[in-house]
Each structure stands twice: as C-alpha cells, then as structure tokens.
C-alpha cells in the first residue's frame, strides 16, 4: 500500500531521460507533484538488450546514481521499471538528451548506452565494443524499431496517453550572452541538426504528444547547478514547460491510488 501522503500530491511523475526532463520534474515537485522514478542513461536501443561488460570496475563511478543507472542500462530494464510504476504514474516525462553520445555494441545485438559519467571515469577503456554514433544510418536503423517497441510497451501499460516528449533544442547562447561550449565535442548546432531526425521519427511513427519549447526560452544558465552545458537551461524554461504540462493535463484523470 502506498502512503496516504503520496496519494495527495498534485500528480505523480515518472521520468525517462536526462537532466532536462528531471529538472522539469523538479519544478513540478515545487508545485506539489511527486517523482516516482527516474530512469536515466538508457537508450531506446539498449533497452531490452542486456550487455556483457565483463569485469568492469563500477567503483570508478563516483555516485550511486551513476552506478545505478549503469547497472539498469547494462541489463536493459526499461520495460521492468516502467511496468513497476505504470499503475501510479500520471505523467511520463521523456526527453532524448541521453541519446546524444550513441551506444556501444558489446556483442552482436547487445548494447550499452554511452554516458558522460562512464566516459569521465574511463569505464569503457579496454571494453571490446563497437561505437554507433548518433545520427548515423546504422544508429537510426536500430533506433526506429526500438521506438516502435517502446510505443507498443507504453500502449500495453496504458501509458501512451500519459507520455509527453519534451522537445527542446540545445542552447547556442548563455544567460550572459556568450556562446555555449561544446559537450563532448558536439556543438549545439550540430546536436540540434542530428536530433531533428529522431524527433521526426517520433512524430511519424507514434501518436505520442510532443511539447515544443519556444526558441526564445532556449538559453543556457551560466550558474546551473549541474554546470555549464547547452542542455542546462535557465529557470524560465523549466517554469514554462511546467506551466504547459499542467495546462495540458487539466482536467486530467489521475492514475488510481494504490
């Protein structure tokens, strides 16, 4: 049984994606919503495709969040995680930023999502794996059927109508008027050009709702708590997204309390 306190929130959120969706959820928490689960660093391609990583030293990952995310991605447990929270999720927030670094094919048909934490820790050094870069024909060829499987999963769990993809481009400028710095070799313009193809696939292949953030709000925050990056935005963006989500969901039928 879930506690009485948890059933009295404005609504319950599951996050699948990066800090982009999580920071929006953080804004909504301040408005009385609760975050039930945060599923991060797991590409649609690696979901359901457990990877063999051998004797990787997980102690190299400094945070429990990074270790937990790596292990979840390693076993590809997106379906299990969504199944566990589907009945009490009012809103599934999704963004594609964690797709940006591509995937590693550790053996034929098994994949691992590249993450900043694992790259920084040198976790992939010595790992026999093939890199599939975002935006390449091979990556897109794998991502499209993975998207269809994801959509079918959402339909099966009755989550499709409760899912919203946040489509926000990387910022090219900061709150101080400076140009944003590249992230792992990707500039904002490069990343935005590549990511457009993936957003278009969601439009074309599914009926999931997509929330497009206005360009004038796409400004990176020089003082963001996670540091400087083209996808760490000023607070006004998160407030706008939260406003739009609450408008679009009201009146809404919340998931039944357990």
Regions found by a protein language model. Name each.
Residues 85-88, 145-165, 197-211:
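A structural motif corresponding to the C-terminal end of an alpha-helix
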Residues 2-90, 223, 248-249, 256-258:
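Basic, amphipathic N-terminal segments that precede the first structured/catalytic domain
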Residues 225-258:
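Histidine-centered active-site loop/cap adjacent to the catalytic His
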Residues 173-212:
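Substrate-gating cap/lid alpha-helix
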Residues 165-169, 207-224, 256-258:
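Acidic carboxylate-rich catalytic motifs and surrounding loops in phosphoryl-/glycosyl-chemistry enzymes
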Residues 57-132:
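A basic- and aromatic-enriched beta-loop-alpha substructure that forms the phosphate/nucleotide-
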Residues 101, 120-148, 177-189:
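Surface-exposed cleft-lining segments at the edges of enzyme active sites
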Residues 75-79, 136-152, 185-200, 235-236:
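Well-ordered, non-membrane alpha-helical segments in soluble/globular domains
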């Amino acid at each position: 049984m879930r506690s009485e306190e948890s059933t009295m929130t404005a609504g319950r959120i599951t996050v699948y994606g990066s800090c982009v969706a999580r920071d929006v959820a953080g804004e909504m928490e301040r408005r009385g919503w609760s975050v039930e689960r945060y599923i991060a660093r797991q590409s649609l391609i690696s979901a359901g495709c457990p990877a063999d990583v051998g004797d990787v030293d997980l102690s190299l990952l400094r945070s429990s969040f990074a270790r937990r995310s790596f292990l979840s991605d390693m076993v590809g447990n997106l379906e299990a995680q969504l199944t566990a929270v589907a009945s009490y999720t009012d809103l599934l927030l999704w963004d594609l930023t964690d797709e940006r670094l591509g995937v590693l094919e550790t053996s034929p048909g098994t994949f691992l999502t590249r993450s900043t934490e694992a790259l920084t820790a040198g976790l992939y050094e010595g790992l026999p794996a093939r890199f599939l870069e975002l935006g390449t024909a091979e990556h897109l060829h794998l991502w499209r059927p993975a998207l269809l499987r994801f959509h079918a999963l959402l339909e099966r769990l009755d989550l499709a109508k409760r899912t919203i993809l946040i489509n926000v481009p990387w910022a090219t400028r900061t709150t101080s008027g400076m140009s944003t710095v590249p992230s792992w070799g990707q500039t904002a313009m490069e990343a935005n050009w590549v990511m457009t193809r993936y957003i278009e696939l969601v439009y074309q292949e599914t009926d999931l709702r997509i929330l497009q953030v206005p360009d004038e709000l796409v400004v990176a925050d020089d003082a963001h708590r996670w540091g400087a990056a083209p996808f760490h935005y000023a607070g006004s963006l998160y407030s706008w997204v939260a406003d739009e989500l609450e408008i679009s969901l009201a009146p809404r039928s919340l998931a039944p309390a357990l």
